[in-house]
C-alpha cells in the first residue's frame, strides 16, 4: 500500500518542485511511521470533491502584529474543468504581499492550504533568517507526531456546522530553541469541514496575543503576530 505522503507528491507532477516538497511533508520518513489523523485530514482528503467547476472561492486574510504594520487582503481560488480534470489557479494575496503558487492541472487537495504554509514559511525565514527546509521539517514533524485534532462547531454563512480543528506547535520542543526562542509558542490551527466549499474553513498562525498591536508609544519586546485566513464565499453558489 502506497504511503499517503509519497502518494500526494506523485499526484502533482506538474506543480513545481517547491510545491511537491511541501505536499510530501516528509516523504523521506514515509516508511518509518504511518500517516497521522492530522496528515490525513490535511493532505490525504480530496477537499475539492464536492465542488462543481467552474467556481471561485474567496477567503479573507488578516494580519495583526506588533512587529510591523498589519494588513487585510484576500485569497482567491479559481477552479475549472480542463480535459475532464479539475484545474486550480490560486491567487494568494495581492500587490506586494502576493505569493506565487504554481497552477495545478489536476487538483484534489485544496491548494489554499499550501499557499498559507508557503507564505508562513517564507515569513519565518524573513523574520528569523532561518532555513525554509528547517521550518518545513518542524511543521512536518508536528503534524506527524504532535497534532491535536478536536471537534469544533463553526458558523458559515449563518449556519452552524461541525468541523475538525488541527492544532500544532512546531517549535515548542525545538532542539534549536535558543535561536528561535521568541517563536517557541507559535501555534497553527487548521479548521476543516466537509460542509463548507473547498473543505477548509479557517487557517491561522498565532504568536502571542493578537489584540496587542504595535503603537508609536507602546513598544513591545515579545513579538505578536497573528495571521488568519477565513472562507467567506463561493460563486456560483454550490448545491
Annotated model-derived regions:
Residues 90-92, 98-123:
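Surface-exposed, glycine/proline- and aromatic-rich loop segments on solvent-exposed faces
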Residues 33-104, 130-239:
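Acidic, serine/threonine-rich low-complexity disordered tracts
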Residues 28-32:
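Sec/Tat signal peptide C-region and signal peptidase I cleavage site
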Residues 1-11:
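N-terminal secretory signal peptides that target proteins for export/translocation
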Residues 15-26:
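Bacterial N-terminal signal peptides
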Residues 119-129, 133:
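Extracellular/luminal beta-rich ligand-recognition
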